Amino acid sequence: MTSTLETRTVTRWVSLRPHHGQVPAEDLVDGPLYVEPFSAADLPAIAERAAGVVIGSAWMQDFQLVRAVARLGLPVIVQRGHSATLEEWLGVADYCVAEGNDQVVLCESGTRTHLEHVALDLTLLRAAKARSGRPVLADVSGDPSLAPAAIAAGADGLLLSPSASDADVAAAREAVTLFGALAGHEPPTTLPEARAAIDRVDAALATLLERRAELAGVVQSLKPVGGFAGRDMERERQLVAAMALRAPKLGEERLAPIMNAVIEAGLRLAEER
């Protein structure tokens, strides 16, 4: 469970709705996590024990409860109702702000289709980010395999089912790390944010370097002459030139020694196998 909601995160939470008010909130909220209340009766325990509140898609138009939640002063995640428009969704965030709480994060929860499935609307997610200027999560509870697509579309984080398996959580975190490194364009404003962004880029870079080394090993096995003796310097120059088009600030002069080190590491690895 996360105690704070930062961008590029995976958030787990607990919902009190399935218990229909039959179980006291005190028995279910046992740590700093995000909680979806069943009714206003749950709010005192949430205020005392929770790190934040989830305004679930099923009751985002219960404006009395929305206002009461906002007055707790905790961070709020506003899920979009499955049939709610963009304006209705953003309007709930405005209700929270009107109560003096601007700690609002939006969460795209999907639209119910004619097949009775709920499908994420990534276009609406991007529109919500552009219109509101707020972080927007993607609820991938129904299909955690959509995590990479959601992050690539610009989601600032993912919301998983309270019952998500450890494997689903691990896969979602990997999607946030790898795809977040490629999709994130907002400049960090603090040192911890900047370091976290660099860590994500480094993780993605390590994954790509490992994959490149594997492919280089395949190439060595297919070439008539492999290893250092079979290096194709002209191809390597073309590779660096092509990379410089993607990384013009680094340019060929800086990229050349980097790629030489990468290529030599791959060749040595191939020789060791």
What residue spans do the PLM features occupy?
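Short hydrophobic/charged patches on amphipathic alpha-helices used for structural packing
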Residues: 43-44, 147, 195
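Catalytic alpha/beta core domains of metabolic enzymes, predominantly
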Residues: 61-189
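Active-site beta->alpha loop and helix N-cap motifs at the rims of alpha/beta catalytic domains
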Residues: 3, 10-75
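Surface-exposed amphipathic alpha-helical tracts and adjacent flexible/coil segments at the periphery
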Residues: 1-18, 115-119, 170-196, 209
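Glycine-rich, proline-tolerant flexible connector loops at the mouths of alpha/beta enzymes
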Residues: 13-31, 164-167, 219-230
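Conserved acidic residues
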Residues: 51, 156, 202
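Catalytic cores of large soluble enzymes that bind and process phosphate-bearing ligands
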Residues: 18-25, 81-84, 116-120, 167, ...
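Extended, charge-rich alpha-helical interface modules
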Residues: 178-273
